[in-house]
Design a protein with these regions (language model features):
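NAD(P)H-binding glycine-rich loop region in Rossmannoid oxidoreductase-like domains
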Residues: 39-79, 92
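Mid/C-terminal beta-alpha module of Rossmann-like enzyme folds, strongest
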Residues: 202, 209-254, 259-260
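N-terminal Rossmann/SDR dinucleotide-binding element
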Residues: 1-56
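NAD(P)-dependent short-chain dehydrogenase/reductase
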Residues: 140-191, 198
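SDR active-site strand-loop-helix element
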Residues: 16, 57-61, 98-104, 108, ...
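Catalytic helix-loop patch of NAD(P)-dependent Rossmann-fold dehydrogenases
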Residues: 78, 83-86, 106-107, 111-152, ...
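C-terminal amphipathic/interface module of NAD(P)-dependent oxidoreductases
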Residues: 256-283
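Glycine-rich Rossmann NAD(P)(H)-binding loop
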Residues: 159, 185-190, 215-222, 271
Length: 283
């Protein structure tokens, strides 16, 4: 996202994070600068807004590990709700468009069992874990406070991770299979995986189109985690017999997750012209 936005002449981009700059090479472009700021530090965030006076704020920060959030409620709420609320108030004060990233985990995963459909933006959230609950509450803060905003729900984002970033399912499968290691993947959880390049394109479209509301910015094909793994193995000509599909019960995850959280992109396709690629195309 930083790289793509910095490549456009009309944007001057400031990246800020609790951690050190993950893309220092962009510093040489003169279209990008990095400032180290903790989103939980209210005074520092206020000073940052005062110094930059941003036209657009894109919030990619979150405490996004469901198992960790389940046992660290206070920290999860502080980052995913309280800090988001502060950003929303500052965006309102500075008349900045606020683009806030959220997640498919705001849903309970039962819609397909009832209707056979994908989740649309109009369906009310019903999270099954604390991470999803905090992201839902963060969405509500943005919608209640801001007059110029977009909430971008994303899902299973994959692509080449930069140094310091945690990996993703595609890289995990590739690395394990290349090393000749077995990998267990869930065969009864469905997702709409999102290529990071398509996500970046969707965010840019949300900058240029000032429609308010929630948009699903994800892929347009619904796959199980096991199907994702097999597609990666087949394309890379790696040993697919090292992939062991298991059920959710067999995986014994400590935190509940939605079984089916495939999201519809028809709203984003119609209003934004968003047209993501399929996993096989990206590979």
């Amino acid at each position: 996202l930083l790289k793509d936005l910095s490549a456009h002449k009309q944007y001057n981009v400031t990246g800020w994070s609790l951690h050190s700059d993950i893309f220092p090479a962009l510093e040489n472009t003169k279209k990008y600068r990095f400032i180290e700021v903790d989103i939980r530090n209210e005074a520092s965030v206020k000073e940052l807004f005062k110094a930059i006076c941003p036209d657009v704020v894109i919030n990619c920060s979150a405490l996004s590990v469901p198992d960790y959030c389940e046992t660290h409620h206070e920290e999860a709420y502080l980052i995913n709700v309280t800090a988001v609320e502060q950003l929303a108030h500052l965006c309102k004060e500075y008349q900045s468009r606020f683009i806030h990233l959220s997640t498919d985990f705001v849903f309970d995963g039962k819609i397909n069992e009832r209707t056979g459909q994908l989740y649309t933006e109009e369906i009310l959230p019903a999270p099954v874990n604390y991470y999803g609950f905090t992201k839902w509450k963060g969405e509500e803060k943005v919608a209640d406070i801001c007059s110029n905003y977009a909430i971008a729900r994303v899902e299973i984002v994959y692509g080449k991770a930069l140094p310091g970033q945690h990996g993703n399912i595609v890289q995990l499968v590739m690395n394990r299979l290349k090393a000749g290691q077995e990998i267990r993947v869930v065969s009864d959880q469905w997702r709409t995986p999102t290529f990071v390049g398509d996500l970046s394109d969707g965010i840019r479209r949300l900058i240029e189109n000032t429609t308010n509301g929630i948009f699903h910015i994800c892929g347009d094909e619904c796959l199980t985690i096991a199907e994702i793994a097999y597609q990666v193995a087949d394309y890379m000509k790696l040993n697919r017999t090292l992939i062991y599909p298991v059920t959710t019960e067999e995986m014994q995850e400590s935190t509940p997750r939605p079984r089916f959280s495939g999201m519809s992109i028809e709203k984003a396709r119609t209003i934004l012209g968003y047209n993501p690629r399929k996993l096989k195309e990206v590979l």
